[in-house]
């Protein structure tokens, strides 16, 4: 996986240099993989490695109303429909957005479906606070998912923040200004 992360890092950085006035180096440790597949089958490294340059060329930086639907469709495997959600709330007086996409279906062997979920926000929150909020909110939601008492070995959820909302800096996980965000994250 490190070789693929290195290739993605290199190609994304290269694309940014061509597309952006202020390109940033994208390091391989900033790339996260969510894997799904049949246990015991080899991961198709070469197929994925060969596909990366073309996939990165197709990246568009413009936002449109279909971007989250496209992202949800892009991670579907055995799902019958895309799974996405969006919430708006406030941190202090600043409006922030939370988007979530997921994949996963209620199936067990031989077609067990891995649940992968990704949450994105424009809230300006530290990694430490995001991790604490996520951990608190998955206890009775994501971590309570099972299918006939089984869970997949690769289930994962991750949260990402761009910080572009420019809300007031929050220093403590228990800050009351986070209550609306916390409630929205739990939906």
Feature locations, PLM:
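Glycine-rich, mobile lid/loop segments that gate access to catalytic sites or pores
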Residues: 2-14, 24-142, 152
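Membrane-embedded hairpin module used as a gating/binding unit in multi-pass transport
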Residues: 137-144, 156-166
